[in-house]
């Protein structure tokens, strides 16, 4: 299916894994390791979809979502967070309130993220917002 995806995450290993998964699925990928760079790249590259972590140094994902939703044609957004079960769920709920099209709790399967992304770009939701899992790989 493809499309252009901007991935924003301060975890270099996860950023690499997500980039590879999207590239293998036929997406063009732009990556940023913090919210400030992500906002700048979103403006320069006009992605179809932004996948952003919530808890990051510099500008958090919440700030990035706010900024990206203020442009004339905002991208679709998937917010991800692994900030503990209760706190992570609060962050994801707030991200949804601010305009994230979908949310996904860490840990997640890359195939799940790619499938959700394809659905969001196509204009639907893969499934109701995903709540934190109780076990890795769940």
Report the location of each language-model feature.
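Active-site residues of response regulator receiver
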Residues: 53
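Charged docking surfaces used in two-component/phosphorelay signaling
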Residues: 16-24
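Receiver (REC) domain active-site loop signature in two-component systems and cognate sites
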Residues: 56
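Short hydrophobic/Thr-rich beta-strand motif most characteristic of the beta2 strand and flanking loop
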Residues: 26-33, 41
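Acidic catalytic/metal-coordinating carboxylates
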Residues: 33-37, 60-63
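Alpha4 helix (beta4-alpha4-beta5 surface) of REC/receiver domains from two-component response regulators
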Residues: 63, 84-104, 111, 115
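Hydrophobic/aromatic residues positioned on beta-strands within the core alpha/beta folds
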Residues: 80-82
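Short amphipathic alpha-helix used as the core "switch/output" element in two-component signaling
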Residues: 40, 62-74
């Amino acid at each position: 299916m493809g499309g252009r995806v901007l991935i924003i995450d301060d975890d270099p290993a996860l950023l690499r894994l997500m980039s590879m998964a999207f590239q293998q699925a036929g997406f063009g990928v732009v990556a940023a390791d913090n919210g400030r760079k992500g906002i700048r790249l979103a403006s320069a590259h006009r992605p179809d979809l932004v996948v952003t972590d919530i808890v990051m140094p510099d500008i958090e994902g919440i700030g990035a979502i706010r900024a990206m939703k203020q442009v004339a044609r905002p991208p679709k957004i998937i917010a991800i967070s692994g900030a503990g079960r209760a706190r992570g769920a609060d962050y994801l709920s707030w991200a949804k309130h601010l305009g994230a099209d979908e949310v996904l709790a860490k840990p997640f399967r890359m195939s799940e993220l790619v499938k959700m992304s394809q659905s969001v770009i196509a204009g639907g939701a893969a499934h109701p917002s995903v709540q934190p899992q109780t076990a890795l790989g769940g």
